[in-house]
UniProtKB/Swiss-Prot annotation:
Keywords: Lyase. Its EC number is 4.2.1.41. SMART domains: DHDPS. It comes from Pseudomonas entomophila (strain L48). This is Probable 5-dehydro-4-deoxyglucarate dehydratase. It catalyses: 5-dehydro-4-deoxy-D-glucarate + H(+) = 2,5-dioxopentanoate + CO2 + H2O. Gene3D superfamilies: Aldolase class I. One of its GO terms (biological process) is D-glucarate catabolic process. One of its GO terms (molecular function) is 4-hydroxy-tetrahydrodipicolinate synthase activity.
Amino acid sequence: MTPQELQSILSHGLLSFPVTDFDAQGDFNPAGYVKRLEWLAPYGASALFAAGGTGEFFSLAASEYSQVIKTAVDTCATSVPILAGVGGSTRQAIEYAKEAERLGAKGLLLLPHYLTEASQDGVAAHVEAVCKAVNIGVVVYNRNVCRLNADLLERLAERCPNLIGYKDGLGDIELMVSIRRRLGDRFSYLGGLPTAEVYAAAYKALGVPVYSSAVFNFVPKTAMDFYHAIARDDHATVAKLIDDFFLPYLDIRNRKAGYAVSIVKAGARIAGYDAGPVRTPLTDLTAQEYEMLAALMDKMGPQTV
């Protein structure tokens, strides 16, 4: 798959990022991961991000990363394209990128470098180095310490033909508009704020109709129903799902830092696809919060295809 073919795929439909399965000892559980991917594939996501932020990329050892990406690529070979999360220092990100390409990933999601303060010129050099290390398509994730502006992204687009996507996790509307207007069709644009559904209508109005869904991990039918309602401008259905599900969901998710991942793993367990515990420094939901989420999911009804 060429980077441009991947860009076309990422320009339409709903995207998601499966959680990574761990066993009771906290080790990668490939059998559980295969079961998860096989369950999610028929629901119709356009692409899946393996070992992304919600997939706890930041907690995986290098050997585990290879297992996760290989398992995802092999399992989804005939069903849905897999993009691999990559990040860390520039040299680490390049190593992960080359490994993901070797294992057959169709593209990369370049996560922000961790903790280290850097100028945005330095961040741009980091992105360029990763792009030039591989031939597959790369999506850059503007979030936290990565805050690339339209000028830098335009420069990167000229230098890196395989930089084909921009994912926004900042929520800076002025910046998003300037990037979208400047870069036009050069990129695919993805909404990437946590619980992106809450912002989906606003981002669609900005020319960003595609987003990645965390709740697809445990209420995939509800996630697809919401996406289709956004796509057809069914404002009544959008409003009802936001009121009935997404706002109460946020009330739980926002109780502790890191719950954006923890609540997804809790939801997967409630749905019958237990992915095990989150790894430290994240913490799992309390028993009370777990029951609150279970009651909320029950209101959404069966999640059959």
